[in-house]
Amino acid sequence: MSGQLNVAEDSVLLDDISISSIQPIVSDVPAAEDVGDEDHISGASIAENRPKDPTLVKYHAACQRGDLKTVKDMIEAGVIDVKADWDEEEQVSGLHWASANNRLNLVRYLIAQGADVNIKGGDLEATPLHWASKSGYVYIVHCLLEHGADPLITDRQGYNLLHTSTFSSEVMLITYVLFTGQIPVDSPDPTGKTALHWAAYQGDPNTVEALLKFDADVRVVDTGGFTPLHWATVKGHPHVLKALIEHGSDVFLKNNDGKNALMIAQEMNTQKALQNALYECGFNKDGFAIRKYFKNPMHAKMVTFFTPWLILGLILSFFAYFSILLAILGCLLTVLAAGYGLYNFVFPSFILMKRIVIFKTPLLAGILSGTIFWLLYVWLFKMLPATFDDEPILNLTVFALFAGVVFLLTKLLQSDPGYIVPATDHNQIRATIIELLRVGKYDSKHFCIHSWIRLPLRAKYKRFVHSVILRYDHYCPWIYNYIGFRNHKIFIYFILLLDLGILALAKLCLEYFDELKDHAKNKDALKCSILSKDLCAGFTYDPFTLFLLEWVCVQGMWILALSFVQFFECLKGVTEHEFAHWQRRNRGVVGREHVFNTAPEELMEEDPEEERNKLRSLGAAGQRHCCSTLTTATGFDRFLSVIGSSLGRQPRTTHNPINYPIETDYGWKQNLKDFWLTSDISAPMWRRILLPPVGTRGLLNGQEVDYQKLYNLPERVISIEEIV
């Protein structure tokens, strides 16, 4: 069984998993500033409790807490010999303790003084490289390897650097080790388990993904006949199971006990996870291929896109020509039948998810385009013939506006929001990693663990399309596409034309109803208790058009709210994604995304937000109401949030007494210029305003920047009001 990795962004929450190992490991000894003679270390020793050399105890404690001054004083005074700085029975050196506690400066100093980087110590006879890698300390591992540490050395259990790195579940370290190219990805331990076996057993999707990208063998078996899929089934992590199945794991392969993955899942109560993974890979619960009714996924998407055109026409007809009860019944039956057909016969051909997220299908885009289709239909065949003589300018305006809407919608559906192609050149990727290590920024905030590129500022990786998007704004299900640097301006023009088109069409529709009223044969029949005479004429003589107008006005409300949000964010020089992050930051709420970072303290830049993260609580972030899906789809959640911020109602928490400025806000005038003007100053002004940016270059604070290589923001002057 094999297939292409296609994980829906919203359904896969791998980014929610925190595998940070920034906290140092310490022994039993309290890490006091001054270690007295009575202190002792016993945490990682094979020796029993016994009196120890107080000088060695003090030295090891200093190595643990990174006290470089004390270590230097003891070595330079001759009290400690760095080439024999261990207890004879334990064999745990100062380099072991410094490595295990992420003390980079101390590690460098000890190596410079002649410490053996390959010395084995402790009950597992492990090297400093093993100690550092088990904690995920990539900077220490890099330093040790640069100074001659052997990655192929194994400890007493037979684990090499790749195995111990896998145990840490620190994906930044795993990626680094793989790109060194010094260890075969399928190197086994004494029981025949590879790193992929261990990662699968741990339920570590990020490590599994990295190993599979390096062509780790999914069919290799250990001494018990277990494949990585067998061990993944024991753990039951659905995303790990899915990745292994997609890369060719055989669900029917049996281990030495004669059990396949299906049997193990039943014994370990992980059947649901395995069945979900099988389904998302195109197989039923028994492991056999699901029938797909469309060989070409694009054909299935087209059916999904055009289905709302028909459904919308039927629903409007039901309400126009049947009683309210029959109309509601007809609508329910139509929607249920359409949903059943799409879910069972259409969706499986292009998206396989147990819980289909309609946002990730062209369905909502079909609703929007279907609405436009029926609007054009009633305008062309009903309103235009009846009103052109009296309202020729208004009719031409409606035609021009909706011609623009159709053109821009077609363009948006096919547009590139600013994708960055994932890196494939291993030498280039390796150089990027080394550079980030050099500057202390090798973490998932600056390096994409999925596409292996250095992440520019304002960019974001989206798993649904397996790409990083420049100046990412948001995902819009109504155009079935992401909004980013290259199509953001088109999107705003689109919603602006929609707003104007709805207003013009509503006015023309009222003129049309007025014509119906004037030409009515029996004007006494126009009796409506709550409607005006014009609307009453529409209800009496053309209810289809009246209900379509009502539907369009409802749509117009959220489009108007979306327009307000977009223009507000343009004024503030911020994207929707950045604005949401800024609000969470000011509320003191921890986001779902975690930065995988094991940089030593001496390399970490001061970031007050990281300190505040320790005090934050998810609190209100986890609260959701019954209409959350609806408000998210229509954008009203962002509208209400923007209204609150514009009125100065940004909440503050006990742990967050100040408001942080928006880093990309250079003043509303400059922000508007940066957004609306392309960076090509030689082009005519109308082209700079109307056309979207070409390539990856744009304006920021009036300066031309390459958004694909934007690693530092232009300087920004902070006003007194922002400081107070």
Curated annotation (Swiss-Prot):
It is an enzyme of class 2 (transferase). It comes from the Eukaryota. Belongs to the DHHC palmitoyltransferase family. AKR/ZDHHC17 subfamily. The keyword DNA-binding does not apply. It catalyses: L-cysteinyl-[protein] + hexadecanoyl-CoA = S-hexadecanoyl-L-cysteinyl-[protein] + CoA. GO terms for biological process: negative regulation of pheromone-dependent signal transduction involved in conjugation with cellular fusion; protein targeting to membrane; regulation of endocytosis. The keyword NADP does not apply. One of its GO terms (molecular function) is protein-cysteine S-palmitoyltransferase activity. This is Palmitoyltransferase AKR1. PROSITE patterns: ANK_REP_REGION, ANK_REPEAT, DHHC. It is found in: Early endosome membrane; Golgi apparatus membrane.
